């Protein structure tokens, strides 16, 4: 029962925060300055499947499927199916162009009650791009692309506990070797890993309603920094952490309802605040981010620069020790604003038909992604078809508006009945 109480508390806190992005005691977005965190290879963090894509991207603690390799490999230890393969397709940024897309192929296989293996291929096509010189003369047309290969392994520690690890190789070729601003460019190559942990209780109760409670933590895309030329600065890839809660209520043999909540944040340093003062690029607040991977992950929890104070003349105010004054609580407010909140619902009828809905919230100072998702599924024997639709809540002109996702899933191994005894 204590786990259900934690789920309710986390859910309530998340929706309270989502519902008050512009209210409260000065903790609103307008108190902070625009300070978006950017990374290289952002395609590694795009939701590939239409199930989580129909639930506000709250996929970390959802019941296992082949697309769990992206969200949370450790949950595959609790899969009811022996194996599954899925194919997903997402036309991307169709408000801007019509030839960018993400394709995703994933599969898993349960070796026995303890060991599960899987893999996935992610391919991101940026469409056709025309390269020109400084005078606007056409040099050539090219079709830049990026891809990622993932190997996955889940190990069941106990009846209700599991861990997972992914090994990844990613390749990003955005320029086709063309010189950019007179500098030779190159493809970016990444080696990365995902780590995940799941607590899974299929004997949970919410009041008198029986169901399944899942709590999961994942650390994703932990890998090397990359650059597209020998002279450019090496940038972080989208390393991130997700904390997920989900409860599936089994009302009867026909109806199941899942509530899912994710808290997500990048594990990448926040850009520091610099300003040219007397011709010198001066650090006003925050911390330099030209550091290593592990140091960057740790620093990401305490490096928000906040809002630097100004006097009535618009000049930055200095402290007695020569540092610059920062508005009270603004650093903490900015750190908290880096947490994205995702929530979703899923209703299944007779394990044949499903409807989904969800919301996603990101601070306007950190990217301003706010959207509503709708989704549906049809399942017949070993085949399932998933669909989702994204409606932007960030205002008119969002490039994410009207995003569609499609997924086909095939159960190719029957049902596994193996159980693990409680330790």
Annotated model-derived regions:
Residues 20-423:
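Subset of outer-membrane beta-barrel
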Residues 1-23:
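Bacterial Sec-dependent N-terminal signal peptides
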């Amino acid at each position: 029962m204590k786990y259900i109480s934690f789920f309710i508390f986390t859910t309530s806190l998340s929706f309270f925060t989502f519902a008050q992005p512009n209210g409260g005691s000065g903790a609103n977005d307008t108190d902070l300055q625009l300070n978006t965190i950017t990374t290289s290879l952002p395609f590694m963090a795009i939701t590939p499947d239409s199930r989580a894509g129909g639930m506000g991207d709250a996929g970390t603690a959802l019941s296992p499927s082949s697309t769990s390799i992206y969200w949370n490999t450790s949950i595959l230890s609790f899969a009811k199916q022996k194996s599954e393969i899925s194919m997903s397709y997402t036309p991307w940024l169709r408000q801007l162009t019509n030839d960018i897309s993400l394709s995703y192929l994933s599969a898993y296989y349960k070796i026995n009650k303890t060991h599960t293996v899987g893999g996935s291929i992610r391919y991101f096509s940026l469409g056709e791009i025309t390269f020109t010189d400084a005078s606007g003369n056409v040099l050539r047309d090219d079709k830049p692309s990026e891809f990622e290969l993932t190997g996955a392994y889940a190990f069941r520690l106990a009846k209700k506990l599991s861990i997972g690890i992914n090994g990844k190789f990613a390749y990003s070729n955005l320029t086709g070797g063309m010189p950019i601003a007179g500098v030779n460019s190159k493809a970016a190559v990444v080696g990365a890993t995902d780590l995940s942990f799941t607590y899974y209780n299929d004997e949970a109760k919410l009041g008198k309603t029986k169901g399944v409670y899942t709590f999961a933590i994942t650390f994703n895309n932990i890998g090397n920094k990359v650059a597209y030329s020998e002279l450019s600065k090496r940038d972080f890839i989208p390393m991130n952490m997700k904390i997920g809660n989900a409860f599936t209520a089994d009302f009867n043999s026909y109806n199941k309802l899942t509530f899912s909540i994710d808290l997500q944040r990048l594990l990448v340093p926040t850009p520091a605040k610099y300003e040219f003062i007397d011709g010198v690029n001066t650090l006003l607040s925050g911390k330099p981010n030209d550091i290593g991977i592990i140091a960057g992950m740790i620093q990401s929890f305490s490096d928000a620069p906040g809002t630097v104070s100004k006097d009535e003349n618009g000049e930055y105010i200095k402290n007695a020790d020569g540092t610059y004054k920062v508005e009270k609580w603004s650093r903490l407010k900015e750190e908290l604003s880096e947490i994205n909140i995702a929530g979703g619902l899923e209703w299944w009828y007779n394990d044949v038909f499903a409807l989904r809905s969800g919301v996603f919230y990101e601070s306007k100072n950190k990217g301003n992604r706010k959207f509503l998702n709708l989704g549906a599924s049809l399942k017949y024997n070993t085949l399932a078809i998933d669909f989702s639709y994204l409606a932007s809540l960030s205002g008119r002109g969002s490039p994410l508006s009207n995003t569609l996702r499609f997924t086909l899933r095939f159960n190719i191994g029957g049902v596994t009945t193996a159980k693990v005894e409680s330790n």
